[in-house]
Amino acid sequence: MAKSPSRSPRKRVRKQVADGMAHIHASFNNTIITITDRQGNALSWATSGGSGFRGSRKSTPFAAQVAAERAGVAAQDYGVKNLEVFVKGPGPGRESAIRALNSVGYKITNITDVTPIPHNGCRPPKKRRV
């Protein structure tokens, strides 16, 4: 039985992106950070829950900071240097995620709040009685 000629394993070439966008979705229960290129194609992402935090600890600013650091380090493999930040939601991880991206070494060029505001749309949830 003849062996087929073995192919040498080709190293996957990652595209180099200088400018990127960071989308931070900060809800009351979790924080999701996605780093994309200019066209919106995802390069890396991380969540508070995926970073090892469970339950009520997912919604802390520290959990958002750890998630932002993980997403930022993963996106550095693509050569991202500058980030434009889009923040959505009222959660506690908004500011700490931006600070964490800054501490990883990105130059933040712009911060935009894209939280959706209803024009008297859906009825909000009832107030909690504790």
Curated annotation (Swiss-Prot):
Coiled coil: none annotated. Pfam families: Ribosomal_S11. Keywords: Ribonucleoprotein, Ribosomal protein, RNA-binding, rRNA-binding. InterPro entries: Ribosomal_uS11, Ribosomal_uS11_bac-type, Ribosomal_uS11_CS, Ribosomal_uS11_sf. The keyword Nucleotide-binding does not apply. It comes from the Bacteria. GO terms for biological process: translation. PROSITE patterns: RIBOSOMAL_S11. GO terms for cellular component: ribonucleoprotein complex; ribosome. GO terms for molecular function: rRNA binding; structural constituent of ribosome. Belongs to the universal ribosomal protein uS11 family. Part of the 30S ribosomal subunit. Interacts with proteins S7 and S18. Binds to IF-3. Located on the platform of the 30S subunit, it bridges several disparate RNA helices of the 16S rRNA. Forms part of the Shine-Dalgarno cleft in the 70S ribosome. This is Small ribosomal subunit protein uS11. It comes from Shewanella woodyi (strain ATCC 51908 / MS32). The gene is rpsK.
